[in-house]
């Protein structure tokens, strides 16, 4: 068809309009992460990094009160100055979270590895999504910068959809899975059992009845599979 781009050209035009991202979870345990900025946005980033076990350094002339407390109790390291290029040395992950766009862009340019720029996702190479954590269940949501507000709205809906009881149920079936691997001999029956206890219907029962009631039902179900009744 006249005027129609070849497939490879169409793909490159599409890629030029929107970046493509690979969803992944990072293991930050013991890794050096540098946050440039000392305000409320930086504070949120620092708290999430610390929760992930990262070794966090904050670079900023000033700190919010909560960041000061984190520094005082030894949770974070603090470099009390305006950003300098050498501040990123050895960082596994860098987050630019100042209120100065020019500084954020300079940090992004200087970063040699992973870089997230708060409020300017297109300037970095990773996006930090909104997330819901229920024990070992982690659900991440991102609009790739199109609407952070919508990401937050969806996250709040997910928080309601997956209450704390789901975390307890997940821990329970996780431990039960190990027993089932040795107790239910048939691979087909074992897979059937796993599907049944992880079904949408079972999750609905957890929401309605609570973790303990459903766990009792699953234990009974497990014994029937063990005995070969199902």
Residue ranges: model-predicted function:
Residues 93-99, 104-128:
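ADP-ribose/adenylate-binding Rossmann-like module
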Residues 30, 89-91:
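Alpha-helix C-terminal capping/helix-to-coil transition sites in glycosyltransferase folds
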Residues 145-230:
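An accessory alpha-helical subdomain
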Residues 75-77:
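Short, conserved active-site loop motifs that form the nucleotide-linked donor/cofactor pocket
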Residues 122-125, 129-137, 152-155:
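Anionic-ligand binding region
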Residues 53-57, 91-100, 137-145, 158-160:
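Short beta-strand and adjoining strand-loop segment in the mid-core
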Residues 2-71:
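Hydrophobic, well-ordered beta-alpha structural blocks that scaffold small-molecule cofactor pockets
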Residues 81-85:
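Conserved SAM/SAH-binding loop
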């Amino acid at each position: 068809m006249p005027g129609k781009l070849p497939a490879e050209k169409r793909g490159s035009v599409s890629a030029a309009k929107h970046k493509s991202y690979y969803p992944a979870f990072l293991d930050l345990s013991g890794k050096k992460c540098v946050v440039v900025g000392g305000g409320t946005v930086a504070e949120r980033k620092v708290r999430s990094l610390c929760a992930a076990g990262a070794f966090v350094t904050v670079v900023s002339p000033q700190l919010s009160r909560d960041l000061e407390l984190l520094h005082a109790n030894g949770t974070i390291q603090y470099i009390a100055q305006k950003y300098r290029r050498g501040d990123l040395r050895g960082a596994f992950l860098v987050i630019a979270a100042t209120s100065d766009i020019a500084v954020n862009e300079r940090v992004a340019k200087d970063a040699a590895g992973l870089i997230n720029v708060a409020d300017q996702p297109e300037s970095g190479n990773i996006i930090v999504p909104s997330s819901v954590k229920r024990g070992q269940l982690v659900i991440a949501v991102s609009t790739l910068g199109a609407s952070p507000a919508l990401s937050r709205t969806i996250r709040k809906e997910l928080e309601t959809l997956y209450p704390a009881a789901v975390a307890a149920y997940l821990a329970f079936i996780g431990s039960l899975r190990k027993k089932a691997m040795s107790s239910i001999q048939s691979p087909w029956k074992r897979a059937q059992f796993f599907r049944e206890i992880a079904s949408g219907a079972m999750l609905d029962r957890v929401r309605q009845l609570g973790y303990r009631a459903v766990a009792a039902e699953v234990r009974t179900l497990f014994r029937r599979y063990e005995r070969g009744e199902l």
